[in-house]
């Protein structure tokens, strides 16, 4: 059975956030045969990057990626095996609760921005125990 991945993306400025996360999602599908759901809070930004995308659709498929609208009023969703919190976005509390209840618990990664600063090497892969009791790991590309 292939692993499932959830990638959460808050569009902050321009299209970098959604562009990087969509590219990562497509690579996980195409190169590693993973099942990937990309949660995006601004589908209009996504639609400008992805020909054929519908900025109004709550769920749509592009290049094998299940692209879902990340609404402020979060609707319950089963957590994936691997969860990526991209670029310091914050997962919905109900999703974190569902992660805590899942057995085994998902691998939770905090994907950070690219940096060439020296301190990055010492922080890459570090665990961070969250108040939920789940470990989150920092990933610096």
Tell what function each PLM region has.
Residues 2-6:
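Extreme N-terminal starter segment of soluble prokaryotic enzymes
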Residues 8-133:
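Active-site and donor-binding regions of nucleotide-sugar-utilizing enzymes
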């Amino acid at each position: 059975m292939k692993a499932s991945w959830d990638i959460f993306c808050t569009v902050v400025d321009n299209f970098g956030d959604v562009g990087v996360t969509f590219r990562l999602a497509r690579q996980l599908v195409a190169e590693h045969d993973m099942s990937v759901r990309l949660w995006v809070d601004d589908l209009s930004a996504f639609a400008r990057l992805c020909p054929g995308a519908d900025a109004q659709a709550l769920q749509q498929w592009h290049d094998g990626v299940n692209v879902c609208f990340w609404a402020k009023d979060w609707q319950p969703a089963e957590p994936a095996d691997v969860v990526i919190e991209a670029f310091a976005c914050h997962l919905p509390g109900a999703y974190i609760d569902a992660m805590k209840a899942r057995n085994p618990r998902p691998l939770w990664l905090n994907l950070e921005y690219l940096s060439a600063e020296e301190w990055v090497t010492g922080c890459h892969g570090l665990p961070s125990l969250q108040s939920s009791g789940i470990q989150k790991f920092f990933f610096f590309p």
